[in-house]
Regions:
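Conserved blade-ending motifs and adjacent loop-strand segments that build the rim/top face
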Residues: 224-250, 287-322
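Short coil/turn segments at the loop-to-beta-strand junctions that recur within blades
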Residues: 26-27, 65-73, 113-121, 171-175, ...
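Short beta-strand elements that form the blades of beta-propeller/WD-repeat-like
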Residues: 42-48, 87-94, 129-145, 193-214, ...
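Blade/loop signatures of beta-propeller domains
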Residues: 1-21
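Repeated scaffold domains used in trafficking and secretory/extracellular systems
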Residues: 31-35, 74-82, 117-130, 189-191, ...
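Blade-loop segments of beta-propeller domains
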Residues: 24-28, 59-89, 94-95, 116-117
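Beta-strand-rich domains and repeat architectures in extracellular enzymes and scaffolds
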Residues: 16-50
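Asp-box/WD-like beta-propeller blade repeats and closely related beta-sheet repeat scaffolds
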Residues: 95-151, 167-178
Length: 360
């Protein structure tokens, strides 16, 4: 794969584009800080320091919770909300506090403890009423101590009764790194990417692991894509060393295959050559990716000439549901040279436009 200033084509994996005009009030902040979600009725959720709820056509409805330090309030949203659409609720992590549980109508249900003794429970996501989670714990590695901070399992899965039904094994747990002894390490592991290819197929991939796994019900988890990296790219052993600070100058200069999104037609990914040459690419299923670029040319319609998928992937602001990818595009992008507005009342100062990419 090579870096190119020439945008790739959106039509390589996108079939059509739908635009949704969001209410102009309340104001939506920097799109790099907003996470998207959708419930079973098609209502939309924009998640940043608050969670705003919208109708399927973009009309603002309400904020899901009150800000404050009282019962059922959130004084500082720590991470994006974690939505269980099958049960119609969202977990919201209060800063330095347990999760608050709300219905998707905004009613406070209860506080959910996220700790067992000194071990924290991090809920990653819900899918079909399964809870995907992992444990995290602060430890201090002594100088010269060998460790793999991902532990023996990357994550675990509970069913709706709370029974653990699956653990995603770390087949590389024998790979260890030697700690230089520089202080506290968070036993958290690396980034885990995941999403929904369709309503009956979920995918998951721990960063720097070459396998994208898929499942329909967690009784059968199997490889969906096998990633073939070039020899210059960082591998899993590199990531193990990086997490404990056991790195060399050569390690720091390695190319990196970063976040991915598994699609039915292939793999959307971010790639880093160096700070000046990084971008997004698309690798077709059973094929090979040739280039990465900062932008993808919109060769499907005439509204927005290019879309910055590199930034959307890097900030994890893409939302994947069934055969769609959702993202926000700033309104002023539709007034740049070569663009045109999809709505007659849109202005450069309007809230961002929600874009739904229908995937091939």
């Amino acid at each position: 794969v090579e870096y190119s200033e020439t945008p790739q084509l959106l039509s390589d994996f996108v079939d059509s584009i739908e635009y949704i005009r969001l209410s102009d009030q309340p104001l939506i902040p920097d799109t790099r800080k907003v996470r998207l979600s959708e419930d079973v009725q098609g209502n939309l959720y924009l998640d940043f320091n608050e969670i705003y709820k919208y109708t399927p056509r973009g009309k603002y409805l309400k904020s899901l919770f009150k800000q404050g330090q009282g019962p059922g309030e959130i004084h500082a949203l720590f991470i994006p909300g974690i939505y269980n659409k099958a049960e119609n609720y969202v977990l919201v992590k209060n800063h330095n506090a347990p999760y608050n549980k709300y219905t998707l109508e905004g009613n406070f249900i209860k506080t959910v403890d996220a700790q067992i003794d000194s071990t924290n429970i991090e809920v990653l996501t819900y899918w079909k009423n399964y809870e995907i989670f992992r444990y995290e714990k602060d430890i201090i590695l002594q100088k010269g101590e060998a460790a793999n901070l991902d532990s023996a399992y990357f994550c675990q899965v509970k069913d709706k009764t709370g029974k653990i039904i699956y653990r995603l094994p770390n087949h590389h747990f024998d790979i260890k790194a030697t700690s230089p002894g520089r202080g506290t390490i968070v036993l958290l592991g690396g980034v885990i990417d995941y999403g929904e290819i369709n309503r009956n197929l979920f995918w998951i991939r721990p960063n720097y692991v070459d396998t994208v796994y898929s499942t329909s019900d967690w009784t059968d988890v199997r490889p969906y894509y096998i990633i073939q990296r070039n020899n210059r790219a960082a591998d899993y052993a590199w990531s193990v060393r990086m997490k404990v600070g056991d790195i060399t100058r050569e390690d720091a200069e390695r190319e990196q295959l970063c976040n991915v999104y598994a699609l039915k037609s292939g793999l959307l990914f971010n790639y880093l050559f160096n700070p000046k040459q990084q971008g997004a690419g698309f690798c077709p299923a059973n094929g090979k990716s040739k280039t990465i670029s900062r932008l993808f040319k919109n060769d499907i319609d005439s509204y927005c000439p290019s879309i910055d998928l590199w930034q959307a992937i890097a900030y994890k602001t893409l939302y994947q549901k069934e055969d769609y990818l959702y993202l926000l595009i700033d309104a002023f992008k539709f007034f740049e040279e070569g663009a045109k507005s999809p709505f007659p009342d849109l202005t450069e100062e309007s809230n961002p436009v929600l874009v739904k990419l229908k995937l091939k």
